[in-house]
Amino acid sequence: MPLSYSAAAAAAPSPLAARSRGLLRRPPRSSPVVVRCKKIDQLRAVNGIPPYAPVSNRSLLSPVTLPIIRDANIKNDTRLRIFSGTANPSLSQEIASYLGLELGKINIKRFADGEIYVQLQESVRGCDVFLVQPTCPPANENLMELLIMIDACRRASAKNITAVIPYFGYARADRKSQGRESIAAKLVANMITEAGANRVLVCDLHSSQAMGYFDIPVDHVYGQPVILDYLASKTICSDDLVVVSPDVGGVARARAFAKKLSDAPLAIVDKRRHGHNVAEVMNLIGDVRGKVAVMMDDMIDTAGTIAKGAELLHQEGAREVYACCTHAVFSPPAIERLSSGLFQEVIITNTIPLKEDKSFPQLTILSVANLLGETIWRVHDDCSVGHEPYSSLDID
């Protein structure tokens, strides 16, 4: 039986399906895999879900030719403005290209003492402004830049200001696990609100409860549909598939993911953590012998948890192990662990820009630009963003 989505997921309508067509190709496995498409064609929706867009290999903010899927008359909507911070300009450009818009003109620079200067170089008075800026490493600098961008838009009389944060830094500091600790996620939420944002758009928060830290509306979308689409295109027999949660805390996410992949069985790696960035795998709950194991998590930081989990899966007889995540933080020694031969493939998205020295042959990068671009348009057009697959994976 071929690998496919569940019937419920396959039946879910998509606004992209009626407008998109084209060809997706993968380069040879001898180099890091980046999903690309013919620039003259539009992307094809598979099973009624949004396709994965090409990932630009440009590191600087410059025009790129990408397929425009959204209606061309968006260009006539002069109230919609998209500005990019310096954290991930290539993703911002892809989002703007999806919407058929040009990025807003903005001047961002650093003074000699490290202070950040932001000046909007076009009017935003009465406009619906979206600021694309993940707070990825260096988290403090990117966060401060976002706050100053929000303040600049507020003082320039923007009607609505939405902070589009593909990766929300400090999301893991969402509770007090020990006495006298800070809940930094709540502090950052307060700062964004006080700076003047009217709304926040985030992708794959570490815990959904963190949405409650904001006193303004939060649109929470999941990057997993992009990964699901890619996995469904691979020739993996559904009877051989098992989805693995690398820890107990990710069971709900992995269960929702497994349900979409032909309702695959679920396994759980039980671990004990002895300090920050250190994980110890204890045992496996479930059967992976002779199976293709797909490990799903929201992020990979040092890769300690997922690498030790992969070792355990191989010991328990797994035939192949895939690692999937939305946010590739990849702090040292993540690259060494992920490229050590434990994984058949490491599948990530581009919510965080990846430097060239962090690439390796098993790496596949998928783009969330279409996902975020469609959500931005729905927010601007006062449409629901709760339509599958844009926000919900039925995670409970």
From Swiss-Prot:
GO terms for biological process: 5-phosphoribose 1-diphosphate biosynthetic process; purine nucleotide biosynthetic process; ribonucleoside monophosphate biosynthetic process. SUPFAM superfamilies: PRTase-like. One of its GO terms (cellular component) is ribose phosphate diphosphokinase complex. Gene3D superfamilies: 3.40.50.2020. Residues 1-36 form a transit peptide. Its cofactor is Mg(2+). InterPro entries: PRib_PP_synth_CS, Pribosyltran_N, PRibTrfase_dom, PRTase-like, Rib-P_diPkinase, Rib-P_diPkinase_bac. Its EC number is 2.7.6.1. It catalyses: D-ribose 5-phosphate + ATP = 5-phospho-alpha-D-ribose 1-diphosphate + AMP + H(+). It comes from the Eukaryota. Mg(2+) binds at residues 204, 206, 215, 219. Residues 290-305 are annotated as: Binding of phosphoribosylpyrophosphate. It is found in: Plastid, Chloroplast. Binds 1 Mg(2+) ion per subunit. Keywords: ATP-binding, Chloroplast, Kinase, Magnesium, Metal-binding, Nucleotide biosynthesis, Nucleotide-binding, Plastid, Transferase, Transit peptide. It is an enzyme of class 2 (transferase). The keyword Chloroplast applies. It holds the Pfam family Pribosyl_synth. HAMAP family: RibP_PPkinase_B (MF_00583_B). Belongs to the ribose-phosphate pyrophosphokinase family. This is Ribose-phosphate pyrophosphokinase 1, chloroplastic. It comes from Oryza sativa subsp. japonica.
